[in-house]
Amino acid sequence: SLSDKDKAAVRALWSKIGKSSDAIGNDALSRMIVVYPQTKIYFSHWPDVTPGSPNIKAHGKKVMGGIALAVSKIDDLKTGLMELSEQHAYKLRVDPSNFKILNHCILVVISTMFPKEFTPEAHVSLDKFLSGVALALAERYR
């Protein structure tokens, strides 16, 4: 679970990188579909699933909107992300193992876009936070 120190580190990092969340989302989703091509199955209804396509950009923005919501609900991710959990479990039917894949891509992108801000301490806290987000999103799968 997240300590107060972790929560403070995530909030501090987000305050520095949040304004770039659309670019982070686009890059992370683009990276995911290239490195983990099996994830494209969830986007087969899109006309263009290439990295940086309008659909990828739009969904990357949505994903990072969810991350922003999670930052604001950091004290109770399970309750705060219940609607998103229900949507992913019942409507979108996303295999929850994919949350971990996307989390890894988000970490990679943030580390390359913000090397100064992405200290080892920020890395640990953000990794724990994203793991908590994945767990909260998987809640409705049980």
Curated annotation (Swiss-Prot):
Q: Which domain of life is it from?
A: Eukaryota
Tissues expressing this chain: Red blood cells.
Query: Known InterPro entries for this protein?
Result: Globin, Globin-like_sf, Globin/Proto, Hemoglobin_a-typ, Hemoglobin_oxygen_transport, Hemoglobin_pi
Instruction: Kindly list the biological process annotations in GO that this record carries.
Output: hydrogen peroxide catabolic process
Task: Identify the residues that bind heme b.
Answer: 88
Q: Tell me if Amino-acid biosynthesis is a UniProt keyword of this record.
A: no
Locate the residues binding O2: 59
* Globin domain sequence ranges: 1-142
Q: Does the keyword Acetylation apply?
A: yes
Check the record and name the Pfam families matching this protein.
Answer: Globin (PF00042)
State a GO cellular component annotated for this protein: haptoglobin-hemoglobin complex
User: Which GO MF term does the entry hold, naming one?
Assistant: peroxidase activity
Alphabetically ordered keywords of this record: Acetylation, Heme, Iron, Metal-binding, Oxygen transport, Transport
Question: What positions are modified (N-acetylserine)?
Answer: 1
Q: What else is known?
A: This fish has three hemoglobins: Hb1 (major, about 65-70% of the total), Hb2 (about 5% of the total) and HbC (about 20-25% of the total). Hb1 and Hb2 display a very weak Bohr effect and no Root effect.
Note the subunit structure: Hb1 is a heterotetramer of two alpha-1 chains and two beta chains. HbC is a heterotetramer of two alpha-1 chains and two beta-C chains.
The UniProt entry's sequence similarity note says: Belongs to the globin family.
Q: Which PANTHER family match?
A: HEMOGLOBIN FAMILY MEMBER, HEMOGLOBIN SUBUNIT ZETA
Cited function? Involved in oxygen transport from gills to the various peripheral tissues.
Name listed for the protein in its UniProt record: Hemoglobin subunit alpha-1
Q: Which organism is it from?
A: Trematomus newnesi
